[in-house]
Curated annotation (Swiss-Prot):
The record marks S114 as: Transition state stabilizer. Homodimer. GO terms for cellular component: cytoplasm. This is 2-hydroxy-6-oxononadienedioate/2-hydroxy-6-oxononatrienedioate hydrolase. The lineage of its organism: Bacteria, Pseudomonadati, Pseudomonadota, Gammaproteobacteria, Enterobacterales. The record marks R192 as: Catalytic role in ketonization of the dienol substrate (substrate destabilization). It comes from Escherichia coli O81 (strain ED1a).
């Protein structure tokens, strides 16, 4: 039987999660079947979703025999919104813990991009026994950069887009989000803008969260040595959102880690270099 590509609609699922005395309706996509599960965690950009973030990576993982879970973190996609005054990454980790508990999944491989990488580290620090392998892309620890003034130009444009969600500001952000902008089609811009504007509560609550706590993503640097999971760190050489030296901090702090840097690549390695990225990840997951 020939392989049938996964679709967002057919794999869409919801679960209720208790958080700080409230019930949140959390959306995720559940793709494929397999003894091992890979959870994909998206970044913090306006309009981001698990499916949109990893659209070029889902089928290769499923075809390789993995069950793939794509979570919409609270405040993104079809999940409920929230004003968060603590660590956003620890919040996402708690939500993920509840989801995998309800799905009766004992252990997961984690693959996170940007905020998703930071949230993957938070999950691993809190529940190390639940993590198989770790893939961190363009994120994983906060803290300052030795070479790049903070906040970076990418983060400045991201925050501006949250406050003024226009097509002009979206294009300004995406113009430095990836290295080669020729793949940024009008259809992609329109889909991302529609995602943003369909959930203005997400945009407003992200801004309120920043006002309540500007440091949504704490510095995990001092705790990286606690991570024992085999870890693949992936970075774009031309990332203008999270500087490449953050990847070097992860490499230095996590004993069982290795670093792969893509040249001619911005903040979206899994999309910009999808074929090479997919093979890199599959080889890493398959190793003993």
């Amino acid at each position: 039987m020939s392989y049938q590509p996964q679709t967002e609609a057919a794999t869409s699922r919801f679960l209720n999660v208790e958080e700080a005395g409230k019930t949140l309706r959390i959306h995720f996509n559940d793709c494929g079947q397999g003894d091992e599960t890979v959870v994909l965690l998206h970044g913090s950009g306006p309009g981001a979703t698990g499916w949109a973030n990893f659209s070029r990576n889902i089928d290769p993982l499923v075809k390789a025999g993995y069950r793939v879970i794509l979570l919409d973190c609270p405040g993104w996609g079809k999940s409920d919104s929230i004003v968060n005054s603590g660590s956003r990454s620890d919040l996402n980790a708690r939500i993920l813990k509840s989801v995998v508990d309800q799905l009766d999944i004992a252990k997961i491989h984690l693959l996170g991009n940007s905020m998703g990488g930071h949230s993957s580290v938070a999950f691993t620090l809190n529940w190390p026994e639940r993590v198989g392998k770790l893939v961190l892309m363009g994120g994983g620890t906060g803290g300052m950069s030795l070479f790049t003034p903070m906040p970076t130009e990418g983060i400045k444009r991201l925050n501006q887009l949250y406050r003024q969600p226009t097509i002009e500001n979206l294009k300004l952000m995406m113009d430095i989000f990836v290295f080669d902008t020729s793949d940024l089609t009008d259809a992609l811009f329109e889909a991302r803008l529609n995602n943003m504007l369909s959930r203005r509560d997400h945009l407003e609550n992200f801004v309120k969260s920043l006002e309540a706590n500007p440091k949504q993503f704490p510095d995990f640097g001092p705790r990286l040595a606690e991570i024992k999971a085999q870890t693949l760190i992936v970075w774009g050489r031309n990332d203008r959102f999270v500087p490449m030296d953050a990847g070097l901090r992860l490499l230095s702090g996590i004993a069982g880690s290795e670093l792969h840097i893509f040249r001619d690549c911005g903040h979206w390695a899994q999309w910009e270099h999808a074929d090479a990225f997919n093979q890199l990840v599959l080889n890493f997951l398959a190793r003993a």
